[in-house]
Amino acid sequence: CTKRLLPVYVYLRRIAEGAQAADAAEKDVCAQLLPLYEAIVKDAAEALTHCGFHTPNHRWAIASVLMMCHRLLGGEAYKKAADAILLEGSDCNADGEYAERSAGNYNRINNDAMIMLAVATGDDAYYEPVVRNLTMMLTYIEPDDSIFTNNSTRQDRGRKIYPKDYYFEYLYMGDVLQKPEFLDAANEIMAAVDRHGLKAMD
């Protein structure tokens, strides 16, 4: 997944360019790795410009990665491909539900993509569907801490899933927008992870 390559690329670049403190040996290793890693990221981004099939969540994930690659690497082709996808408009309705209604999985992937789009473009309008969805999700938490999934059109339908993968979204959006209810939700998710002995968040 190209998205998972980007944090490592940013780290290597920050060390190699001296934007982050590192000893000489680490800086040398990062400087050697950076062009190799950048070539991989560019190849992956180039492949994404050709798009193809895609459900709504794939489109937003691809558009967000392309926009971030444009921000980090330049390349007008990345932005052009992302813009073509974004012309379709968000599939998040006024209630905060995305088209696939996948509260147990794909809604949070859409949220991640919208957050990345906001960061990559500097356009805070991309936060709006995230806020609507996270607000809706506060009403989707069952008494046992799991998520209501019975209206999903995807494979999470009817499954018992806990909201741990929403943790960073609530934490980030709570901080960025100074929304105490989102920060409280992040704390409650962490407490639920502890209560149920769940694996740590990804």
Question: Which residues fall in each region the model found?
Answer:
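Extracellular polysaccharide-recognition and catalytic grooves
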Residues: 32-202
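N-terminal catalytic cores of secreted or lumenal carbohydrate-active enzymes
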Residues: 1-51
